Structures are given as C-alpha cells and as structure tokens.
A protein has these predicted regions:
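Gly/Ser/Thr-rich active-site loops/lids in small-molecule metabolic enzymes
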Residues: 114-122, 171-192
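ATP/nucleoside-binding phosphotransfer catalytic cores, i.e., glycine-rich phosphate-binding loops
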Residues: 143, 174, 184-278
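ATP/NTP phosphate-donor binding region
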Residues: 1-27, 37, 41, 260, ...
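Catalytic core of DAGKc-family lipid kinases
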Residues: 6, 45-49, 53-157
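N-terminal glycine-rich "phosphate-gripper" loop used for MgATP/nucleotide binding
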Residues: 29-33
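Glycine-rich phosphate/pyrophosphate-binding beta-alpha loops
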Residues: 101, 105, 156-169, 235
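A generic structural signal for short beta-strands and their flanking turns/coil linkers
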Residues: 135-137, 151-153, 176-181, 215-219
C-alpha cells in the first residue's frame, strides 16, 4: 500500500491520476465530499476503483452509497465490498459526483467554506443568517425540450439524492441511471420555509408544491449575471450561462455488500489499521 497525504486539490487530482496510469487497482480517498471529488476526478474512465473512507462534514456521497462513517467499518467495506459504476456530472468545466447548485445553496456553501468551522450547526447558522437578506434570482431554464423563465430560491443538480448530513434534496435520484435530477426550489413563503426545510430530512421534499424536479441528461441555465456555484461542497464563480451534463459510468466505486452483516473492524488490513493509529 502507498499512503499519500495531499497538499492541494491539484495534488489530489494529479496523484490519483498518476496511480490510475500506473494501473493501481484501488485508490482510497480519506476525507469529505470535496476531497473525494478531487481524487475521483483523476480516476475518470479508468479501471482503477475508488474507495472512500468518509471523514468530512456532510459526507453526501458516502451516505448515498451507504458507506459506513466509522473508518474501521469503512475499511472493512473496502475489503469485502462490491464494485459499481457511478455517473458524474459536469457543470461548465467543473466535475461533481454528488450535487452542484446555484442560488441560496451556493451562497451558504461559500460562507461555510470561508468560516473555517465545520459541522451541521455552523451550516444551519449561516442558513438562518443569510435567509433573512437573500433575494431569489431569475433564471431561464432549458430542459427536456422546454424553455421557461423561473424565479428560484435555488437550483440543485443532483447526481445522488442528498447534499450531505442526510438532507435529501432529491430522494429518488439514482447515481447510476445516466440521468441528473434538476431540482428547482421556487419562491417559498417565509412561514412555510421551516416546514419545507424539515422535509429534506424526512425524504419527502419531492412532494412539496414549492419544488419542481426534472430528470434529464443535460440542462442549460441562464441567469442575469455571473455568480456563485457549489459543486460537491466546493465554491466557485461562473458566468451567466451554465451548462450541466451527465457523464455516464464515469468511475468505478467500491461499496458495501447490501447483504453483508454488520461490518466488524477486526478484519481491517494490518497496514491500514496501523495507519489510523498514527
């Protein structure tokens, strides 16, 4: 086993890509959705498998794939798991594996990443603070042969069902179906917002009158000006035209066997167990 501590997002990408070119069988990403993104990008359309040991804040991809959040159990799942092929998404020139989005979620992601403090409490604190002063944006949406204008609170492009922390923005999203779920959260009365938000955690938000979901392979969004985006929890700025497409069967990922009993850490490979004791 080769252990490599990444020093930057580019180092993570370049290192995983190098390992794939050297035909390593598995590359293990230890981190949150952002770290997983950086490493998985280097494995696109290669035979090298991605494995995940989740130690991030939201761990949206790991939760969607039912990868244990305990690192010992996650390692056991790697040693005794199945391999599946998952899709990726592309928002202009950026790759994502979990979700990407515009509007309020991008604003919160930017504030959260700049705060230096992690955790669900910090995230929710920014949500409350920013909601008071946030104004919906106007978008032109082209999807499924339709073109229409929409005022929206946020727009999420979901490859998997949740943002992280079991907040399900699109509970029925399938990470291997060759499609993306485009979720348009429309203008919502302030009095209704707590109830709609709660539906994220009950996996019922897809039934809300304030959300429209479109399943597609590509979508084009035009907004009034450049602005923030988020992709797998990372922040960025893009122009007024946003093109989002699905990349089918982009990465091979090791996931737990559905029929496996509860995973026990006693089976952890000695090299990895020793590594975690450091």
């Amino acid at each position: 086993a080769v252990f490599h501590t990444t020093t930057s997002s580019e180092d993570a990408y370049e290192s995983s890509h190098k390992f794939a070119q050297q035909q390593y069988d598995i590359v293990v990403a230890i981190g949150g959705d952002g770290t997983v993104n950086q490493i998985a990008r280097g494995l696109l359309y290669t035979k090298t498998k991605l494995a995940v040991i989740p130690v991030g804040s939201g761990n949206g991809l790991a939760r969607h794939l039912r990868i244990p959040l305990s690192y010992h159990s996650a390692v056991d799942a790697i040693l005794d798991g199945n391999t599946i092929s998952i899709d990726a998404g592309k928002i202009n020139d950026r790759i994502f594996f979990c979700t990407a989005g515009l509007g309020f979620e991008a604003v919160i992601g930017d504030k959260f990443n700049s705060s230096g403090t992690r955790g669900l409490f910090t995230y929710m604190k920014f949500c409350v603070k920013e909601y008071v002063k946030y104004r919906n944006e106007k978008y032109q949406i082209e999807v499924g042969g339709r073109r229409f204008n929409q005022d929206a609170f946020l727009i999420t492009f979901a490859n998997c069902g949740q943002w992280g922390n079991n907040a399900f923005i699109s509970p029925t999203a399938d990470i291997s179906d060759g499609m993306l779920d485009v979720v348009v959260w429309k203008k919502t009365p302030a009095v209704s917002m707590p109830f709609v938000t709660a539906e994220l955690f009950f996996k019922t938000i897809q039934h809300s009158e304030y959300l429209d979901t479109y399943r597609c392979k590509e979508v084009k969004i035009t907004r009034e000006k450049q602005g923030l985006i988020q992709y797998d929890g990372e922040s960025g700025v893009m122009g007024d035209e946003i093109n989002v497409t699905v990349l089918e069967h982009a990465v091979n990922v090791i996931v737990p066997k559905v029929s496996s009993p509860s995973l026990q850490s006693k089976h952890v490979a000695p090299q990895l167990k020793d590594f975690f004791k450091k």
